Amino acid sequence: MMTLIWYPKCSTCQKAKKKLEELGASFETRDIVTQTPTAEELREWIRRGGLELRQLYNVSGRLYKELNMKERRLQMSEDEQLDLLSRNGMLIKRPLLVWEDGVLAGYREAAYEAAVKA
């Protein structure tokens, strides 16, 4: 089973959900604000998805800019960054698609199609 971690008001997240439905994928949704991922979940997803920590940041988000995260994160340890992300779901890139064998950060139609077919 896949989990789509999303912000329901986000148009890109809505597109991702619609694509999963069109593909007939078995998935559940999780609101990134009300059920923010834990630091340990984020650490595991980085490993599982072959991601870099920086790829989990919502760099176009208002909060990222308000907190000057482009510069600030460079002064923070990985643990500090994961803790901050786990307390502020709006800092996390969305949607996140999580399944047993992988993780996708952001929405790319072809990547979603490949993940569902795998």
Task: Report each predicted region and the residues it spans.
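Local sequence-structure signature of Cys/Sec-based thiol-disulfide redox active-site neighborhoods
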Residues: 1-23, 27-32
